[in-house]
């Protein structure tokens, strides 16, 4: 199945899945599952991938070589997102410590007492036993594979490597 993913189809698939993932995160946030510092940072890859994959999808017909190069970039970005999601999931499972920005302390004085700090080491929600950070790792890894498959596609619409 992945061998049929030309650059345009791969880019479009990434656009759709990345958009759905980010919209899902916003819906969970609106439902009261406030994101932690690491959760918000993980969204950065999606903020990049959504417009970039749309641009690649639109331009792939006229510039397949450029689209393939762009998909390699997306593969690296989403691989980084998968690693970051796995790191965050590890923090939630207490396998390792998270950054200091993920816990509340009063060392900053009174103004910080009004600021809500969501702990990064507590999963706000688990779906089928996997936290949202874990799902981000899985989805990002799948998107990295899709991007790589699209970049490596050797069809009639692609330029040979």
Regions picked out by a protein language model, each given a short descriptive name:
Residues 93-133:
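Extracytosolic (periplasmic/ER-lumenal) interhelical loops and adjacent juxtamembrane/interface segments
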Residues 5-16, 62-82, 145, 149:
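Interfacial segments of alpha-helical transmembrane regions
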Residues 54-63, 148-155:
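Structural signal for the C-terminal ends of transmembrane alpha-helices
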Residues 27-37, 160:
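Membrane-interface helix-loop junction between the first two transmembrane segments
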Residues 117-161:
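A hydrophobic membrane-anchoring alpha-helix module
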Residues 53, 71-85, 101-109, 140, ...:
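Hydrophobic alpha-helical segments of small multi-pass membrane proteins
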Residues 34-48:
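Loop-to-helix transition at the N-terminal end of transmembrane alpha-helices
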Residues 20-29, 79-95:
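C-terminal TM-helix exit segments that contain a strictly Trp-centered aromatic cap at the helix terminus
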